[in-house]
Amino acid sequence: QDLLAIDEIVMYGSNTDEMVAEIKDRYPNRHCIIYPDPASRQRKTRAGGRTDLSILQNAGFSVKAKNSHALVRDRINAVNSRLLSSDGGRHLFVSPKCKQTIKSLERQTYKEGTSVPNKDDGYAHTNDALGYLGEYLFPVRTEYATPQPQRWT
């Protein structure tokens, strides 16, 4: 199944209420499904102690959020598997209108010697957002064998 990024909203220094207003203004009378950070269940905004998730739900959006965060590597793998699957297929297509998304996918860096995204380069936020969507719809899990304790012989 393909994932199409056809538009983006980039707002610096905004809050959830402002984002809701922008979505409703830009896409009136549309059914919108939001895939937020799972922390939106607990995170309180500056506006009266409401959670980000409750603001989105009360605005009439369908909200799809897991109860807890997937591992960062699982979110990255979910997006990467859409960019290029194991069979060589491409399943993530980004419109040229999505300038920040394209820039973020091209320029994301990682902390030296790790697979941990560098949050200081200005590109992580857009990729995080794409990761929550990708991991919710197309989860990729790496199962690691649990080592069994060995008895001394």
Task: State each model region's role.
Residues 120-141:
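Acidic, Mg2+-coordinating catalytic module of metal-dependent nucleases/exonucleases
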